[in-house]
Amino acid sequence: KFDGRAYEGLIEGKAALGWAGGAVLAGNLELKHMNSTRLLAALGSDLLTEGELSARLKLDAKADRLDSLVEALRVGGGFEIKRGAARGFDLIEAARSSGRAVARGGETKFEQLTGVIQYGQQESRLGDLRLTSGLLTAGGNLGIARDGKLSGAMNVELKSSAAVVRMPLAIGGTAKAPQ
């Protein structure tokens, strides 16, 4: 069992390491109020987000040798980022352009972004994504390959006093340059 402070937030967890036909790791991890920009940078992620991250995660790994556990690590669970921004793409501008052109650059500010992460060595998946920001709501999923390539889709809804615009958007490009 462990707890501490990291990236302007708190981390708590419990893990067990065993040897049953190889090295086995199982545990739970809770992150509270962490700086998502600093945490993702420390993990080597190219995703450009900012905001206050909280998550409840399960960890597991099984390998023939102890020194191979990190390569076999799988992480999954729910997360929430509050008062943040996703940099590199602007969902509002992409929805307004109605898919006529590939949207690049900008940022999407949000009050809340929630979802489920499944991390593996070959690919990570962000599912059940739900983003809210005033009159903007979006939901979808995103895959991030080991080489940083993105694949996914978002359904974006923009409300105004006169109309509601709904737009399905495909996500591609890379984590450094989404489109």
Predicted regions and their residues:
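Small-residue helix/turn framework positions
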Residues: 1-178
